[in-house]
């Protein structure tokens, strides 16, 4: 503050901040949306297109405490004194309740005009803001949120990486982003700071961690290139919600789970964000919706990539955990339907599997080259299909990330032995992993989405994406997609055939299918041989996220490959410690982030179970009352030998 | 059992208290005269019956036992409703169970009728070495709140019989002096004038099973 004051007064203040660091401290007086007057509250902070979410403060009694920060790059306009677009200079705070089922619930929102705040000369301001209802809705008492806003120059301290910004031009604020992008490339100023620890750790977060810890992922690296950013402690906790990571799909399992549930939020969000959101939302939507039908469909064909994934899962179901760190977090209830689909349990020969994965991984690494890396001989069938499909997919697929995910899924589905292979691969291609994970998340999300998001009109997005993707995607695709697509494409076909000689293939196929489906979904128009299958799923174009980052990534990717390879080796070494038969084997290969994700997933599962138990208890409760009042004799303890055992 | 009813009254009892204080064991000890060493914890609701004699009157005690008062809210309401007697149990070896008595008492007062006789029972009196709550303080608590009080042991059977009997005597006394209106909907007492069509037949279980030994 002193600085600001000293600087002088007036809108055209002397110092022009380049960044604003927003720390969401806490909220109070929130409405209770959860059981027992509690809420699982989290806050979404957004400036322009940039958006971050805090972790979920579970069971908060109306007064969650987050203390999580995000740093946003300020539009130059602000600093220069010209009038920036209001939206670009407005800090939007949205508090949501993470719903276990369905859309997250809106708890309140507040807007802070950063221009005004800056005009006030204060460099830093900690203040409570009253939460309001969505625009157009009657105001209720929604409590307030305390936020610390600090203007800064040269934000070297950004705690979080901004994944979202780089490439999207979709947003109305595209211009701003472009500027930002330029900066990022040069300065590596990552303004980001996302906080999305919520339900399931976001893929992004994982990536971040990776980059920090391992620097495996080249693409990611580019984003996070700044060391300072990596250092920031918060970064882990935050994930960029709307992100468009260059390589990876942004979707995270957590996202799907409906963090963004409220419609109002979507509106507010930038277009790119909205797309993502929609996907997420859809995912969160009820299972009952038609989309689910896909899941339930016994036929693989009918299933979208999701189904494919599940099938994999089924085989692997015992070990939900995945390989490579791409664990598949199986989605609980739906799994059953998946099982049907699942290809006959394969006892895949781990070795063969490994080889494959290795190939793929290597290919992935090589992915830069547009060529399709021929996969193992076993893949031949796949290849046939793949050729035609790949082209289409290339065009259609804007999101390379999906593919990786699919592959990851397949791996996961495989037996533990497979896991090893997968791990190798993952290590090699951390990028892929991230993608995979994103894919996984996407898949899961899609499932959810499909279920829940019938009502949502997503189709248009897909087309848009296509256009965008067309440009951006190509680069990405070349690298990653090319390599994998052939496999994937081929795989889907095989899966359709229904019988894959190799269990591994099946798994892959399922993955491929999933990927294909996912691809198809976003771009329904593209005529892909598998389209019929995909169509069922199609409704959700969301899966394709706006992955705009292309060029920068590529450069990074090259570097990343080397690192990845080394990592793979390391991972292999580590992995050997566990016998495939060892239950721990599946987990041994997981990265820290993955484990965290797994834990979060488990927690979510548990909370769902608890909810189910609660429902059952309520039912029993009412039933008992009726019995007590109408036929109490039923409850009488048997006179002679009690029901209870253990009499002396 | 030649007549429709071999008792004149039915008293509804409830047993309340923290988990693990021995509610079910008290019931079992009273109805079966046995101690369940490893009594599984009660999940739902059940009751036991036994006929006792007070002042020459045969009285059937219908003793309800439940658990999960936290989870079964509706049951809990129904459980408390119409209780003529309540056994409020704590474990003399666990002070926390004693400390929770005031909340149990509040529930009992709020959910039963004013004439409900409440008897405080300090269970596990056989575990003297592990005693964590003195007799004196519990006795004082009981007196301050107008409760009957006994220390008992479901394991040895000590005072178990008396606990149920003391409460029954008090209830019967209330009936005799008119302070307990048998016609009140929730008195928790049914009078069976030796004829099947006794006065207020609520939803109370019919006694036809008496002596059937199943």
From Swiss-Prot, chain A:
Annotated segments matching region Disordered: 164-470, 483-503, 516-555
Biased composition (Basic and acidic residues): 164-188, 381-394, 422-436, 445-454
Every C2 domain range: 1-129
Cellular component terms (Gene Ontology): intracellular membrane-bounded organelle; membrane; recycling endosome
Molecular function terms, GO-annotated: small GTPase binding
InterPro entries: C2_dom, C2_domain_sf, FIP-RBD_C_sf, FIP_classI, Rab-bd_FIP-RBD
Task performed by this protein: A Rab11 effector protein involved in the endosomal recycling process. Also involved in controlling membrane trafficking along the phagocytic pathway and in phagocytosis. Interaction with RAB14 may function in the process of neurite formation.
Name of the protein: Rab11 family-interacting protein 1
Organism encoding this protein: Rattus norvegicus
């Amino acid at each position: 503050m002193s600085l600001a004051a000293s600087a002088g007064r007036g809108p055209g203040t002397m110092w022009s901040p380049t960044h604003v660091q927003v720390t969401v401290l806490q909220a109070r007086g929130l409405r209770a949306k959860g059981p027992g007057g509690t809420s699982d509250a989290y806050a979404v902070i957004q400036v322009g297109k940039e958006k971050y979410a805090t972790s979920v403060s579970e069971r908060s009694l109306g007064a969650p405490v987050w203390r999580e920060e995000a740093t946003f790059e300020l539009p130059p306009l602000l600093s220069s004194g010209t009038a920036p677009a209001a939206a670009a200079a407005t800090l939007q705070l949205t508090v949501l309740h993470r719903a276990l089922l369905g859309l997250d619930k809106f708890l309140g929102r507040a807007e802070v005009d950063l221009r005004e705040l800056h005009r006030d000369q204060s460099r830093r301001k900690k203040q409570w803001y009253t939460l309001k209802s969505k625009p157009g809705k009657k105001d209720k008492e929604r409590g307030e949120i305390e936020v610390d806003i600090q203007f800064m120059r040269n934000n070297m301290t950004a705690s979080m990486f901004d994944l979202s910004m780089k490439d999207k031009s979709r947003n109305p604020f595209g211009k701003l982003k472009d500027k930002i992008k330029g900066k990022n490339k040069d300065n590596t100023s990552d303004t980001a700071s996302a906080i999305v620890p919520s339900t399931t750790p976001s893929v992004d977060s994982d990536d971040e961690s990776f980059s920090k810890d391992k620097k495996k992922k080249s693409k990611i690296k580019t984003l996070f290139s700044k060391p300072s950013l990596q250092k920031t402690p918060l970064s882990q906790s935050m994930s960029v919600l709307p992100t468009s990571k260059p390589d990876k799909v942004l979707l995270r399992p957590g996202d799907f789970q409906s963090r963004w549930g409220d419609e109002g939020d979507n509106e507010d969000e930038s277009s790119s964000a909205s797309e993502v959101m929609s996907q997420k939302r859809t995912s969160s939507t009820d299972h009952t919706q038609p989309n689910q039908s896909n899941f339930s469909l016994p036929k693989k064909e009918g299933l979208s990539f999701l189904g494919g994934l599940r099938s994999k899962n089924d085989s692997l179901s015992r070990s939900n955990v995945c390989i490579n760190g791409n664990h598949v977090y199986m989605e609980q209830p739906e799994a059953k339907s998946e099982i049907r689909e699942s290809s006959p349990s394969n006892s895949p020969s781990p070795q063969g599997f490994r080889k494959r994965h290795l190939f793929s991984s290597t290919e992935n690494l090589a992915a830069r080259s547009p060529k399709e890396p021929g996969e193992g001989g076993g893949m031949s069938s796949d290849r046939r299909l793949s050729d035609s499909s790949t082209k289409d997919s290339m065009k259609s697929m804007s999101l390379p990330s999906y593919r990786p995910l699919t592959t990851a899924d397949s791996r996961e589905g495989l037996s533990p032995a497979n896991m090893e292979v997968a791990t190798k691969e993952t290590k090699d291609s951390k990028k892929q992993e991230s993608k995979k994970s994103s894919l996984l998340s996407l898949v899961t999300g899609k499932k959810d989405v499909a279920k829940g998001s019938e009502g949502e009109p997503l189709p248009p997005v897909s087309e848009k994406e296509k256009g965008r993707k067309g440009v951006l995607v190509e680069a990405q695709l070349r690298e990653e997609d090319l390599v994998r697509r052939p496999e994937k494409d081929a795989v889907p076909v095989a899966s359709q055939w229904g019988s894959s000689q190799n269990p591994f293939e099946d798994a892959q196929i399922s993955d491929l299918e999933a990927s294909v489906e996912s691809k198809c979904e976003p771009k329904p128009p593209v005529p892909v041989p598998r389209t019929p299958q995909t169509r069922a799923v199609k409704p959700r174009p969301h899966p394709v996220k706006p992955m705009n980052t292309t060029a920068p990534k590529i450069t990074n990717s090259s570097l990343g490959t080397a690192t990845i390879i080394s990592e793979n080796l390391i991972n292999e070494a580590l992995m050997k410690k566990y016998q495939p038969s060892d239950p721990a084997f599946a987990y041994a290969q997981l990265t820290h982030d993955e484990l965290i994700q797994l834990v979060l997933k488990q927690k979510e599962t548990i909370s769902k179970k608890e909810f189910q138990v609660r429902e059952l208890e309520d039912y029993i409760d009412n039933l008992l009352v009726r019995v007590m009042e109408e036929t109490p004799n039923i409850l009488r303890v048997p006179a002679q030998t009690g029901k209870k055992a253990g009499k002396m | 059992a030649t007549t429709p009813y071999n008792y004149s009254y039915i008293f509804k009892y409830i047993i309340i208290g923290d988990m693990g204080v021995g509610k079910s064991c008290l019931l079992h000890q009273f109805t079966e005269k046995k101690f369940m060493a490893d009594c599984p914890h009660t999940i739902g609701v059940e009751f036991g019956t036994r006929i006792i004699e007070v002042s020459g009157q045969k009285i059937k005690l219908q003793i309800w036992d439940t658990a999960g008062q936290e989870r079964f809210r509706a049951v809990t309401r129904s459980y408390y409703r119409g209780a003529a007697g309540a056994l409020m149990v704590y474990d003399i070896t666990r002070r926390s169970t004693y400390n929770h008595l005031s909340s149990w008492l509040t529930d009992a007062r709020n959910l039963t009728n004013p004439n409900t006789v409440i008897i405080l029972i300090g269970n596990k009196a056989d575990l003297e070495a592990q005693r964590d709550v003195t007799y004196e303080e519990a006795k004082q608590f009981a007196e301050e709140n107008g409760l009957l009080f006994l220390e008992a042991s479901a394991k040895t059977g000590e005072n178990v019989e008396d606990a149920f009997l003391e409460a029954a005597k008090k209830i019967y006394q209330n009936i005799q002096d008119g302070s307990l209106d048998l016609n009140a909907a929730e008195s928790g007492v049914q009078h069976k004038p030796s004829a099947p069509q006794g006065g207020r037949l609520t939803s109370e279980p019919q006694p036809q099973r008496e002596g059937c030994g199943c």
